């Protein structure tokens, strides 16, 4: 969620990709090309003039200028590569849905195991997804309330370090509070902390309301389709098929997080800034889709192995939070992708 927050603050107000893209090289691009041409030096040898061409590698300063100079043609290509990457991930997900959903796999999935589940396992999974639906509803209400409060909306839209720091503190504090309260021993405070956490997340999502209701409604439908399809894949796949992806997903999360941080300090119209933006946006969409597969099977596994009368009880709110954060990350990226896509068509 931290990466999603950073990307949203950096990219939405600035509207990185303008509706029209230049097709001719700008003066800055021409100057860069001129500086990097062959260096021609005359020399005299035995009364005969010859031209000697020497190769000159780019200096560190020139590499920095090339990475930071504006080039809308390159930015457009980088954006297209990111969208093709997402399209490839969608094709793989659709293939997995057909493969596992049609029962082509020889291994037993969670949906087959559900027939022999005890009733308490079914109740645990049902309550987990009910809390997920409640969190999404509370987040939407909170975002709407913040959007209709000018003072709060202005604070969330500034993008200053004070806003970012306060947002981080609120998210981390609310998350720690929810996890620290016992679901069995203190149900009242637990539910209050859960609602507080959903409200904080709604404030984080509130800046997206500037994109308009129709676009956000489309993003919500697309997100519902993505989450529903991936949840079906996780249910139909072998019960531990995606639980071995923890280490690669951690590496990918670090890459997306670093790209999100880097995009804050680089001009969005530069090649380097656009590259980091694409990694954080499009790579993040694929990454959190894979996280959703992992977390869904993790929730099912926890519901199965947690003993009914053990010392450690099953907590549906804590179990739901990972899927909720994945869903929120996917929604924010889908909404931003739709916004940049509609900008280009104008």
Swiss-Prot record:
Mitochondrial intermembrane face residues: 105-126, 182-191, 236-245, 294-346
Family annotation (PANTHER family): BAX INHIBITOR-RELATED, GROWTH HORMONE-INDUCIBLE TRANSMEMBRANE PROTEIN
Post-translational modification comment from the UniProt entry: Undergoes AFG3L2-mediated proteolytic degradation, upon hyperpolarization of mitochondria.
Function: Plays an important role in maintenance of mitochondrial morphology and in mediating either calcium or potassium/proton antiport. Mediates proton-dependent calcium efflux from mitochondrion. Also functions as an electroneutral mitochondrial proton/potassium exchanger. Required for the mitochondrial tubular network and cristae organization. Involved in apoptotic release of cytochrome c. Inhibits AFG3L2 proteolytic activity, stimulating respiration and stabilizing respiratory enzymes in actively respiring mitochondria.
Protein topology in the membrane: Multi-pass membrane protein
Localization, UniProt: Mitochondrion inner membrane
Single GO term (MF): calcium:proton antiporter activity
Protein name per its UniProtKB record: Growth hormone-inducible transmembrane protein
Primary location group: mitochondrion
Induction section of the entry: By growth hormone.
Subunit architecture: Interacts with LETM1 and AFG3L2.
Protein keywords: Apoptosis, Membrane, Mitochondrion, Mitochondrion inner membrane, Transit peptide, Transmembrane, Transmembrane helix
Transmembrane segments: 84-104, 127-147, 161-181, 192-212, 215-235, 246-266, 273-293
Taxonomic source organism: Mus musculus
This protein's encoding gene: Ghitm
Record: transit peptide: 1-45
Record-stated family: Belongs to the BI1 family.
Reactions performed catalytically: Ca(2+)(in) + 2 H(+)(out) = Ca(2+)(out) + 2 H(+)(in); K(+)(in) + H(+)(out) = K(+)(out) + H(+)(in)
InterPro entries, alphabetized: Bax_inhibitor_1-related, GHITM
Alphabetical GO biological process terms: apoptotic process; calcium export from the mitochondrion; inner mitochondrial membrane organization; mitochondrial calcium ion transmembrane transport; mitochondrial potassium ion transmembrane transport; negative regulation of release of cytochrome c from mitochondria
Mitochondrial matrix side: 46-83, 148-160, 213-214, 267-272
GO cellular component: endoplasmic reticulum membrane; mitochondrial inner membrane; mitochondrion
């Amino acid at each position: 969620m931290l990466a999603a927050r950073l990307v949203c603050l950096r990219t939405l107000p600035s509207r990185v990709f303008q509706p029209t893209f230049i097709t001719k090289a700008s003066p800055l691009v021409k100057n860069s090309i001129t500086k990097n041409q062959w260096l021609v030096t005359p020399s005299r040898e035995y009364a005969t003039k010859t031209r000697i061409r020497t190769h000159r590698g780019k200096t560190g300063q020139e590499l920095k200028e090339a990475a930071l100079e504006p080039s809308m043609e390159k930015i457009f290509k980088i954006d297209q590569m990111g969208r093709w990457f997402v399209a490839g991930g969608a094709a793989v997900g659709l293939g997995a849905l057909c493969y596992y959903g049609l029962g082509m796999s020889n291994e037993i999935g969670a949906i087959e195991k559900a027939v022999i589940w005890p009733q308490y396992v079914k109740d645990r999974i049902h309550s987990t997804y009910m809390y997920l639906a409640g969190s999404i509803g509370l987040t939407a209400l909170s975002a709407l309330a913040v959007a209709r409060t000018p003072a709060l909306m202005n604070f969330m839209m500034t993008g200053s370090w004070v806003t970012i720091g306060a947002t981080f503190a609120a998210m981390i504090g609310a998350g720690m509070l929810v996890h620290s309260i016992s679901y069995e021993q203190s149900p009242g405070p637990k539910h209050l902390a859960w609602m507080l956490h959903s409200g904080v997340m709604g404030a984080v999502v509130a800046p997206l309301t500037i994109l308009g209701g129709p676009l956000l409604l489309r993003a919500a439908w697309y997100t519902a389709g993505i989450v529903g399809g991936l949840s079906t894949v996780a249910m139909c796949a072998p019960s531990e098929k995606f639980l071995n992806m923890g280490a690669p997903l951690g590496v990918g999360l670090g890459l997306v997080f670093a790209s999100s941080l880097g995009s804050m300090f680089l001009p969005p119209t530069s090649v380097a800034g656009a590259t980091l933006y694409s990694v954080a946006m499009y790579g993040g969409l694929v990454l959190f889709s894979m996280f959703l597969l992992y977390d869904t099977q993790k929730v099912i596994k926890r519901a199965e192995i947690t003993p009914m009368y053990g010392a450690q009880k099953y907590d549906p709110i804590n179990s739901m939070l990972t899927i909720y954060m994945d869903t929120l990350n996917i929604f924010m990226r889908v909404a931003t992708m739709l916004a940049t896509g509609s900008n280009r068509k104008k």
